[in-house]
Design a protein with these regions (language model features):
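Conserved active-site and SAM-binding loop architecture
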Residues: 1-83
Length: 83
């Protein structure tokens, strides 16, 4: 199971996903402090800062660079914190 976290803050949903055995592959968080936390605990994930241009195409390109096209074969869970 793949997790993508929107409005991720300091990674609460990503931590819960880890506890569930899911892999967080991408996050989107605009706050610089939250970005530092996410980069520290999920260094291999793609981290984006602006939800306005966080599109499927962007995710596909960035995740394919990191994980190859096989990431598309898993089920995807998208979570969203409150902005």
């Amino acid at each position: 199971m793949i997790h993508i976290g929107l409005f991720e803050g300091i990674g609460g949903f990503s931590l819960a996903a880890k506890w569930m055995g899911w892999k967080t592959l991408a996050t989107c968080e605009i706050n610089p402090f939250g970005q530092k936390i996410l980069n520290h605990y999920w260094p291999n994930a793609y981290h984006h800062s602006d939800i306005h241009d966080f599109t499927y195409e962007t995710i596909d390109i960035e995740l394919s660079k990191r994980f190859g096209s096989s990431w598309r074969n898993d089920d995807i869970i998208v979570t969203g914190g409150f902005p």
